[in-house]
Amino acid sequence: MDTPMPPERGGLRRLYGVSRRGINLALVATALIAAHPVQTLPAKGQPPLSAATQISGGVRADDQSALALDAVELWLEPDPATQRLTGRARLVLRATAAVARPAIDLDSNFTVRRVTVDGAAVTPARPDGRIVLPAPLPAGARATVEIQYDGTPHVAVNAPWDDGMVWAKTPDGRPWIASTTEGYGCDILWPCLDFPEGEPAVATLHITAPAGLKAPANGRLLGVDTLPDGRTVWHWRARQPNTYAIALNLAPYEVIEGTYRSRYGNAIPLAYWHLPGRDDKARGLFAEFAPTLDFFERVIGPYPFGDEKLGVVETPHKGMEHQTINAYGNDYAKAPEGFDWLFQHEFAHEWFANQMTAANWDDYWLHEGFASYMQPLYARWREGEARYAVMMEAQRNQIANRAPIVRDRILTEEEVYEPGKGGAGTDIYYKGSWTLHTLRWLIGDRAFFAATRRLVYGRPDPKPGNFTPLYASTRDFQRLVAAEAGQDLDWFFDVYLRSAALPELVEQRSGGTLRLSWRTERDLPFPMPVEVQVGDAPARRIAVPAAGATIAVPADAHVVIDPFSRILRHSAAVAAFQAWREAQRTGK
């Protein structure tokens, strides 16, 4: 998920009290009440989602495994008065192989009013959370499917960690609406193919906003139409958005705009939609856009969506990497590192999630590990090694080591994020970040950033216009790292990503001899070199092969192992601190 410190779904999350709001008809005659019942708006967590709808990703069923989405066009109108959504979707489906009964995902809380295939009305089956078309789609064929639907969408309990609609109010009482869908999937908002590789090649959005509200969204603004009753329709178009990146944002926004002249020669539109009355704070955040963009373009490569915009919108939830319209809800909090970590983290996802998308939830550490590593790396770029070390240390203390980050099979979102279902949880953020930190030291900056660049762009020489969004896997990254480093590093990824426990460095000192060896889960090979500093001498990199390493040191010398904390490894001190912290939290 986008935000690096999500509450655990297994019981540590903060639950909101149930609140129901209705029209107050206390002064209306009893007969009138009977004729016009009180309308109760849905509470958080309502209407409930079925188990099928909550699943996002996983093994694709036969009725979807050969489907691709060439284009989607959505007409969406949320109504804050009733908290209902009226929608129409036009999907251009393509079959890469014959599909007997093509299926589209859509939450059962929506009523499907009409479905047409290539203009002809059809009656689809509507099993739990799906729309199954009655006719086959031959290999290579395309079909244009139109779906009219409406209903009460699921209201988020605690967005973005529990997805759904957020029907909030601005400080002056006006509607402030947002949606998040990463965890439960795109089907809680629009008819889609709810798996990572279900991205539409192009998405066109038509969002109707109540009078006085604006509707910033993904991609490039095509225009705004004003209806006779004061409502407005906002038209947007985006290239290959992530399935969960399509989002609703409506409020009485004000916008700050500018243009960034990229080092690659292109002009990138900048826009920040914020609530009224927060101009000074909003301009402070907007001032971070250009230097942050410069960092990413220098270190990683060109901003992937420069032909559309760098867009950010203030939201009534913490944040999410909605493509070209990143959700921001950090309330302009200040931090000692001097930049807004939430903005920087979500913006990192434009490279690590939206340009390069993990092909399977099992590979989502490529999103969150890289995006989490970008905050200390940016701090290093701004202030140097000391700030970098401080931020890396804070991440180190969050690593839980409950489960492997990568399991080499197709997983659902819940199987990755929820420890109760075997998931690594927040380790895909912090352990992923530390894995990259150690890898960068092991192979050096040139190889590390070259492999990263090829992972993101699919080529070593990205320039605006010569790349498109792509899918990637952990194995892809391993191959790129091996090619750039000139060595097989499968042992590195097997220990850090495919094992739960951290490697432990065993130190044995006797007289004038220091012996070092590695202990790993399942006795996996781990020939990780180690820096050793003896006395005041500079640290030396010592090879530690399978048989271990023996170093001669003066008997009375002070020895520091890994003095610059290059290597992610078991630490008795960190383990003791984490146990104490947990005892403080639970009162045990």
Question: Which role does the model predict for each range below?
Answer:
Residues 15, 24, 28-86, 113, ...:
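N-terminal, polar/Ser/Thr-rich
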Residues 87, 181-182, 193-344, 373, ...:
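Hydrophobic helix-coil surface modules that form long, contiguous segments used
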Residues 102, 112-117, 216, 489-490, ...:
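Beta-strand-rich binding/interaction modules
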Residues 107-168, 229-230, 547-555:
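A surface-exposed beta-strand-loop module
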Residues 139, 149-203, 256-259, 565-588:
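Glycine/proline-rich low-complexity spacer/linker segments in large multi-domain proteins
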Residues 239, 368-443, 459-469:
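Acidic/His/Gly-enriched intrinsically disordered linker/tail segments
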Residues 290, 327-393, 452:
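Zinc-dependent metallopeptidase catalytic helix centered on the HExxH motif
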